[in-house]
Amino acid sequence: MKKLIAFQILIALAVGAVIGHFFPDFGMALRPVGDGFIRLIKMIVVPIVFSTIVIGAAGSGSMKKMGSLGIKTIIWFEVITTLVLGLGLLLANVLKPGVGLDLSHLAKKDIHELSGYTDKVVDFKQMILDIIPTNIIDVMARNDLLAVIFFAILFGVAAAGIGKASEPVMKFFESTAQIMFKLTQIVMVTAPIGVLALMAASVGQYGIELLLPMFKLVGTVFLGLFLILFVLFPLVGLIFQIKYFEVLKMIWDLFLIAFSTTSTETILPQLMDRMEKYGCPKRVVSFVVPSGLSLNCDGSSLYLSVSCIFLAQAFQVDMTLSQQLLMMLVLVMTSKGIAAVPSGSLVVLLATANAVGLPAEGVAIIAGVDRVMDMARTGVNVPGHAIACIVVSKWEKAFRQKEWVSANSQTESI
């Protein structure tokens, strides 16, 4: 069943691209259908994240264990982010996508509305404070996952502290999680339709011809994402004894959905379910995967480092090695704000450009082709979340390798 859905999604991507290219108006008219699919998934995210984290935190039994898990998770996120940013800098310096570019003939997109969010990205104190919710209902309504995770951990640890009195509540959350996973299976039946509509709308709105003047930038980003998928992640697999290509095969349909929707939230419930079935403990899955949506965006990190060097080259700003390393340090911090604001990657790019003295007006040029790069980098984030989950599980000595049976293993009959 999973293979069938993956095949259907692949066909939907191709058909959607054809519709958008040859019938752009009709393709754009399909946007509400795709947006409806994304909304169906997003309505599940907060209940499933909150319930699974409460169960996992209560099962750990102490704040010390959850703290240890959190520290290991953050360390891994920072290590892999630094490696990816370094790869992006290397590629941009070697391939020089911005050198010789005629800026006068390039389409620019209005990014004025994004400038209001840049202060939020670089205000690190506020970013930390925002993790602590003043109103749990408010952060749930806004899908603020880091704040939801924080409250859920405290709730779960407190529940463990009162012993048997918390059993009715724990049963409620266990049932809630099971219901949400079942609801996810039902919603995923509509995935091919949603993917087709979103692809048709994207190609219809932006067109393929928009890519031609910016081919070197798009090509450099795509090459970097390819190297992450098929060089960096396999090396991580060798070091940590992870069957990477087995994992990639297991989540391939989720990769395609994230690619077409440009949102990893749309695959969060399914990814959590599969990682648990693959052998990662619930307490690790429920913490690492949701927090990774904000803190572990490998594809987005590569895009940011390549784009910053592209801006410097396009506007003939000579950046020394020390300046590039400083920029990478800034990106390590600012990239954690990607999920906190609309058009996250563009906002982070704009904030970083301002911080390191690059011409911010160049972001308007990149914004014109951002959609196609957004699709690719979002897809690459998915195996990054899966790898992080397994690495942390092994670090916790809690990974139990299970035989992954592709046929009907997680998509039950509805």
UniProtKB/Swiss-Prot annotation:
Glutamate uptake is inhibited by beta-hydroxyaspartate and cysteic acid. PROSITE patterns: NA_DICARBOXYL_SYMP_1 (PS00713), NA_DICARBOXYL_SYMP_2 (PS00714). Coiled coil: none annotated. Residues 1-3, 64-73, 166-182, 241, 322-324, 367-414 are cytoplasmic. One of its GO terms (cellular component) is plasma membrane. Belongs to the dicarboxylate/amino acid:cation symporter (DAACS) (TC 2.A.23) family. This is Proton/glutamate-aspartate symporter. It comes from Bacillus subtilis (strain 168).
